[in-house]
Design a protein with these regions (language model features):
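Bacterial N-terminal signal peptides
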Residues: 17-31
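N-terminal secretory signal peptides that target proteins for export/translocation
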Residues: 1-14
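Boundary at the C-terminal end of the N-terminal hydrophobic targeting segment
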Residues: 30-33, 37-39
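Substrate-recognition/specificity elements adjacent to catalytic centers across diverse enzyme folds
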Residues: 42-311, 316, 322, 335
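Hydrophobic alpha-helical segments
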Residues: 465-564, 636
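Ordered core of a single globular domain
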Residues: 438, 451-457, 462-464, 541-637
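Glycine- and hydrophobic-rich flexible loops that cap the catalytic core of alpha/beta enzyme folds
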Residues: 341, 355, 361-499
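Second-shell loop/turn segments in exported
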Residues: 82-85, 134-148, 442-447, 540-547, ...
Length: 637
């Protein structure tokens, strides 16, 4: 048993300044978190409230100090104790959020919220997020260090849970009491399921299904005109593949079937029914919502910064939630000094910096999901036709608990391509590079403890889902960016719409090798940036996707970084809060010209046009023109 000390404010005497990191910053979420925090910004110990607790599971005393923003700063004598303390404070501040995400990932929402959540549970069980997490925990790929840190984190969560469950659970957050249940102990599988669920949330989409319907109804030529693969106005994250000045595609052989477009397809008569069914499931579970959001990150090197060291910004735009998806924390232990944002429920920092490196993330918006039209019939129950023969479907029987009702038996059926995910109409199998065990936990643990460029590159090898643009800086002066993830190589076609699953012609032939994914290091322009746009230019030999975000944000970041030198942290803060609407700057003049050629509408329309005509394209809260432009953009075209 050891002391667990919580101090509400920092003491002036705390000797924890990290002067060597004064120029390495991570700017995260809606606000700005700077490193290092200065001890003198906080009241002295005499002004602090202090509590000391004795908890089973700690190896030595641990101090947890909360700053004026409530951010915990954890000081421990071992990494295991640091993660124990993080689990404890996660459970203290975010227990119900953790429980909801655990149930989302495990397919047990209906156990608490009733039948309305049953289909969400069935869908996530078909994808098999928890089964994948269980396989990861059993895998020998997880070394002893990661296992001990995961177990320590869970022990910290459960220590707090045990305290809250005393007196019949009356100390639990009120929402647990209102719903009438007590959360189960936290396990390493729960922790591993969290990043897998987030990977699906950022990767999953039913766009391919709707594209298939458009191809059938409008024709291939029209669809390719409306949704072109190659848009020359886009600004790629990495204009040339590989290290700076390395020619695009050097040493890369074009992947089979990566050029051109998939042939048009004849969809089965009941395809529309299946498409509507699948879309309903996506809307219900809110998967694929990433396309309405976005993220930015950028980094400048020491030549462009005022300090002579890199400055890095990471600006994730995940959906609004209360509480926020992010949880900021600082952990210090031998071999560990990490600050950044975490997911409550998972021990490792997702975006942040240690005392040697910093990194940030944006969604790559790559295409890692395909749908296969499987051939089944009533004469061959529990079978599907593949390469000239009927094969047995893989079948898993589960029971889904439902509040107030008997558990619902659920049979999950899968083909060689993936689980069958439609309940009506044609049978569609979902292929995703995240099916089965992937090991993002290894990637994040390695990023948390990385000491330099080689460690960063090694960590990327285990970053499979979702595909991310991982931006980087270190105290040696290096800056880099790597669009990275497990991305399929298709034998034929591009997977932009559902394909025949029976022939094997459209099967995947592995994933793009790590060394052939785009990568940039120390560019001559002295900065790098990404904003969910095309990762590599037209002509890159592998198909990565097509639903890139337009380059307006990317161009604005490039504009700001290009025209400034001697950039300070304060400048970076201003860039992050920049409200210039580059999309409006491009389109509003076209709109005004069209109106001037043929005016229409009443006085209200003319007033709206006048607001747009005199707008400076700054999207401030007070801007009437910005609101008008937002309504115009939302109009169906």
């Amino acid at each position: 048993m050891n002391r667990f000390e919580v101090v509400r404010w920092f003491a002036r005497s705390l000797p924890w300044r990290m002067a060597s990191l004064a120029a390495l910053c991570v700017l995260a979420e809606a606000g700005i978190a700077k490193a290092p925090l200065q001890a003198q910004d906080f009241p002295a110990v005499g002004q602090a409230s202090r509590t000391t607790q004795t908890l089973a599971g700690l190896r030595a005393p641990v101090g947890v100090y909360r700053d004026t923003l409530g951010i915990p700063h954890i000081y421990a004598k071992s990494a295991e104790d640091a993660y124990f303390a993080l689990g404890y404070v996660h459970a203290t501040d975010r227990l119900f959020e953790m429980e909801v995400f655990r149930r989302r990932a495990s397919g047990t929402l209906a156990e608490v919220f009733g039948k309305a959540s049953l289909d969400d549970d069935i869908f996530v069980r078909q994808i098999g997020i928890r089964r994948s997490a269980e396989a990861e925990w059993k895998s020998p790929r997880l070394d002893g260090r990661i296992r001990s840190e995961l177990e320590a984190y869970c022990a910290g969560v459960n220590a707090r849970l045990g305290e809250l469950q005393k007196s019949g659970g009356s100390k639990l957050p009120a929402v647990f009491q209102q719903l009438g249940f007590t959360p189960a102990p936290w396990t390493p599988v729960d922790a591993l399921a969290f990043p897998k669920y987030m990977g699906w949330d950022q990767s999953g989409t039913d766009t391919d299904v709707w594209m298939g319907m458009l191809v059938e109804k409008l024709g291939l030529e029209t669809v390719n005109e409306l949704f072109p693969l190659d848009r020359p106005y886009e600004l790629p994250t990495i204009p040339g593949w590989g290290a700076v000045n390395k020619p695009l595609g050097q040493g890369v052989s074009p992947a089979p079937g990566s050029a051109g477009v998939s042939p048009a397809l004849r969809l089965p008569p009941d395809f529309d029914q299946a498409a509507l069914d699948l879309h309903r499931r996506f809307v219900s579970g809110r998967y694929g919502s990433k396309f309405a959001l976005g993220s930015n990150n950028w980094v400048i090197d020491g030549i462009k910064s005022a300090t002579g060291k890199p400055i890095l910004a990471s600006d994730p735009h995940l959906g609004f939630s209360l509480p926020s998806i992010w949880y900021t924390a600082h952990l210090v232990a031998p071999g560990l000094n990490i600050t950044g944002v975490t997911f409550a429920g998972f021990p490792y920092t997702v975006i942040g910096h240690n005392d040697r490196i910093a990194w940030g993330l944006t969604d790559m918006q790559a295409d890692a999901v395909d749908y296969f039209i499987e051939k089944t019939d009533a004469q061959h129950p529990h079978q599907y036709f593949y390469k000239g023969a009927w094969r047995a479907l893989e079948r898993i029987l589960e029971e889904v608990p439902v509040r107030g009702e008997k558990p619902v038996p659920q049979e999950i059926e899968s083909t060689i391509h993936g689980p069958l995910v439609t309940t009506h109409g044609v049978k569609l199998a979902l292929a995703w590079t995240g099916l089965g065990p992937t090991f993002e936990v290894i990637a994040f643990q390695r990023l948390n403890t990385a000491r330099g460029l080689a460690d960063y590159q090694a960590a990327l090898k285990d970053l499979a889902v979702p595909a991310l643009n991982v931006i980087y800086a270190d105290l040696d002066g290096n800056i880099a960016i790597a669009p990275h993830g497990a991305l399929p190589i298709r034998k034929r076609g591009l997977g932009r719409w559902p394909v025949d699953g029976s022939s094997g012609d459209y099967d995947w032939a592995g994933t793009i090798p790590d060394e052939q994914l785009p990568f940039a290091l120390n560019p001559t322009k002295h900065f790098l940036a990404s904003a969910n746009g095309r990762p590599a230019p037209v002509g890159y030999p592998y198909y990565l996707g097509w639903m890139w975000d337009p380059s307006y944000r990317t161009r604005r970041i490039h504009e700001l970084l290009s025209k400034h030198d001697h950039i300070t942290v304060e400048d970076m803060e201003a860039f992050q809060m920049d409200a210039h609407d580059s999309a409006a700057e491009a389109f509003v003049p076209v709109l005004l010209a069209a109106y001037d050629r043929q005016p229409f509408g009443d006085e209200q329309v003319r007033r709206a046009i006048d607001e747009l005509r005199h707008w400076n394209f700054e999207a401030t809260p007070q801007s009437v023109a910005e609101r008008i432009w937002a309504e115009v953009r939302a109009l169906p075209t």
